[in-house]
């Protein structure tokens, strides 16, 4: 009789232990289900973020295309301006040669060239005006440098956002590993949930690989944009320098032509005076 009571007590104890294990397994199952749902929500959120990343990459592609077009236009403008400079240099050479010939004819009237010195003073004042314009152009370049710094700041902000996404992915992976460790302690009823967790893990790793790939593509686009921006800035600088050279050469040509015309008038006046003097001497 005592043996039967003892056996019944053991059976009762086994029953209570079995109930405790069942409750624990049920609790673990519920926790795994909750964690699985949370991971699925995180997966959906991450997919949305990746979609946003793809949109930003498209914008970078458009920006790269625009930068290439601007670079081509600036290089064409610089080439045209350099051609104009060469043409103006040839015109200056011809005008200078003609001026040299005029100065040789006016060698006997050097005493009356004080007015030419005044014209040189006016040319110096004109050069000062050109220098003031150059200073304004330098201020414009400084403004463009400020705008470029702002663009770099925007790019750095984009890098910071991608680093934040990568950090969150690392946190999610850590949470997932801890979830897998707890899931291994569950009873056989949790096996199906474990398979689902493995699937979610694979999806997260795949998404992480995609995020890394997009990050590398973005870095490449940013580097290409930076190179093209530097080339564009160089081409614009060449074009601005060529334009300033053209303006300066045109002003020089105008001054030389004015001086040549004035010298011709002086030569004509001196010739007339000499003719009058010769006529007076002949009359005497």
UniProtKB/Swiss-Prot annotation:
Sorted alphabetically, the keyword list is:
Acetylation, Actin-binding, Coiled coil, Cytoplasm, Cytoskeleton, Muscle protein
GO CC term (a single one): actin cytoskeleton
Alphabetized GO MF terms: actin filament binding; identical protein binding; protein heterodimerization activity; protein homodimerization activity
Coiled-coil stretches noted in the UniProt entry, renumbered to this chain: 1-284
**Pfam family for this entry, one:** Tropomyosin
> Could you tell me which SUPFAM superfamilies the record lists for this protein?
Tropomyosin
Compartment(s) of residence: Cytoplasm, Cytoskeleton
- In terms of superkingdom, the source organism counts as Eukaryota
InterPro entries from the entry? Tropomyosin
- At what positions is N-acetylmethionine found? 1
Report the protein's function: Binds to actin filaments in muscle and non-muscle cells. Plays a central role, in association with the troponin complex, in the calcium dependent regulation of vertebrate striated muscle contraction. Smooth muscle contraction is regulated by interaction with caldesmon. In non-muscle cells is implicated in stabilizing cytoskeleton actin filaments.
- Domain remarks in the Swiss-Prot or TrEMBL record: The molecule is in a coiled coil structure that is formed by 2 polypeptide chains. The sequence exhibits a prominent seven-residues periodicity.
Which family does the UniProt entry place this protein in? Belongs to the tropomyosin family.
Q: How does it assemble?
A: Homodimer. Heterodimer of an alpha (TPM1, TPM3 or TPM4) and a beta (TPM2) chain.
What is the protein's given name? Tropomyosin alpha-1 chain
């Amino acid at each position: 009789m005592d043996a039967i009571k003892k056996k019944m007590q053991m059976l009762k104890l086994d029953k209570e232990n079995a109930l405790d294990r069942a409750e624990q397994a049920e609790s673990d199952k519920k926790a795994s289900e909750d964690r699985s749902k949370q991971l699925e929500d995180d997966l959906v959120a991450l997919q949305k973020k990746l979609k946003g990343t793809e949109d930003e990459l498209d914008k970078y592609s458009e920006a790269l295309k625009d930068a290439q077009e601007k670079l081509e236009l600036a290089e064409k403008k610089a080439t045209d301006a350099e051609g104009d400079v060469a043409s103006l240099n040839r015109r200056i050479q011809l005008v200078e040669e003609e001026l040299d010939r005029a100065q040789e004819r006016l060698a006997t009237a050097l005493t009356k060239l004080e007015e030419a010195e005044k014209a040189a003073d006016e040319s110096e004042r004109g050069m000062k005006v050109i220098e003031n314009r150059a200073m304004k152009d330098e201020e414009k370049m400084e403004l463009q440098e400020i705008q470029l710094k702002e663009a770099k700041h925007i790019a750095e902000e984009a890098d910071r956002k991608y680093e934040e996404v990568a950090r969150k992915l690392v946190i999610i992976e850590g949470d997932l590993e801890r979830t897998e460790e707890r899931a291994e302690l569950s009873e056989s009823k949790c096996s199906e949930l474990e398979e689902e967790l493995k699937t979610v893990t694979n999806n997260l790793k795949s998404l992480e690989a995609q995020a890394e790939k997009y990050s590398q593509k973005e870095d490449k686009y940013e580097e290409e944009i930076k190179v093209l921006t530097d080339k564009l800035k160089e081409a614009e600088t060449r074009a601005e320098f060529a334009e300033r050279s053209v303006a300066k050469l045109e002003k020089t040509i105008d001054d030389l032509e004015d001086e040549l015309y004035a010298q011709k008038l002086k030569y004509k006046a001196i010739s007339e005076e000499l003719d009058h003097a010769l006529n007076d001497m002949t009359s005497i």
